[in-house]
């Protein structure tokens, strides 16, 4: 059902600015689609590098948009020869911080000079694209900051400055990376219990006081306090206490997720806006046909997201562990998944042995996969989009966190939400085999699946009904923040 809450003659005009990585572009596009469905004119701003990459992956007309949904691009300041720059987060963040404000202000000026487009009335920006706040303040329009992390992950980042004040980061030397030190209890972050240093986002685990990401994130969360509001892709029932604790230290915080479920309720998938996608890789839809031939809960889905990389040895251990489990699996293997390799090569013996019980893909429609009845478990890096989509699909997880706030998400999946089993960072095929069997067939797996089903039901209630928490939060956000200037 498409609904519109805006009826005034002058449409509100929102400019959406995602961070240029797949895991940030997708949720921002969902926010843009929801606002479009509510009657907003939308301008979606990619970096020029990703704009061109999207044209290559989705076709020359992919970004034509339509009258009330337009695409623009700004340069990211990096040399054209920089290869796949989405893999170099610190470099991208620093370049954006230094180079993007002027071209962004020029886009806003150009939009506001047009007679056939309503003037910009609000901006939604990714949490790490806060240069846009300067432009919003200069223009006199509200800005909403969208942090694409979990609430628990964002809450830990909000307290990075205290790790420095308490002498917990940066580490004095490499010996502080030991298991013993990483088991240090962290009991002073509001609403977050039983945390250890190892559960905190990886950026604090540095010996360099000038670490780019640690200092960049401290600056960005501080700048977020200038926003009119903050939105999170989560739902109140899942992270209620943490969200409540944030309200006292930040502008109003609105949880409006899971966004993919909200979009499903608000937008007809067959419509023009429903069909619009911004995947940097081509999705292999054959995955769904293969899953259609499988029995319920019989297939393990394996995907480590769009940025995570591993060694060739880790890849091999995962492969042989999956083979030994004798379970059917769908494994997404990006060409750049292995560090230093342009293409992933799996052992021929592995390919031959598993040919009748696996499908390999370079990218897939993950939301659809995780809601498919054949999927019985998910081996994941615990990126937030993946974690939330798994919860929304009622799918339990094997957690292999790598960086950023993935360790925090893993901790909550395993200990707070009751839907995950953690697997060791030093991947061993025997452990992979054991954990896969336990998740798919064991008693623990059964309990995790029951708990995941509870979260699936609560996620649906938050997004499907008029009084669902995320439905109401989105309506409040629109009327109290986005439309406030137009009254």
Swiss-Prot record:
Keyword Nuclease assigned: no
Taxonomic lineage: Eukaryota, Viridiplantae, Streptophyta, Embryophyta, Tracheophyta
Keyword vocabulary terms for this entry: Glycosyltransferase, Transferase
Enzyme Commission code(s) on record: 2.4.1.-
Binding site for UDP-alpha-D-glucose: 364-366, 381-389, 403-406
GO molecular function: glucuronosyltransferase activity; UDP-glucosyltransferase activity
Protein name: UDP-glycosyltransferase 85A7
Organism from which the protein derives: Arabidopsis thaliana (Mouse-ear cress)
Tissue specificity statement from the Swiss-Prot or TrEMBL entry: Expressed in roots, shoots, leaves and flowers.
GO CC terms in record: cytosol
Similarity field: Belongs to the UDP-glycosyltransferase family.
PANTHER family: GLUCOSYL/GLUCURONOSYL TRANSFERASES (PTHR11926), UDP-GLYCOSYLTRANSFERASE 85A1-RELATED (PTHR11926:SF774)
InterPro entries: UDP_glucos_trans, UDP_glycos_trans_CS
Signal peptide start and end residues: none
Pfam families hit by this protein: UDPGT (PF00201)
CDD domains: GT1_Gtf-like
Source organism, top-level taxon: Eukaryota
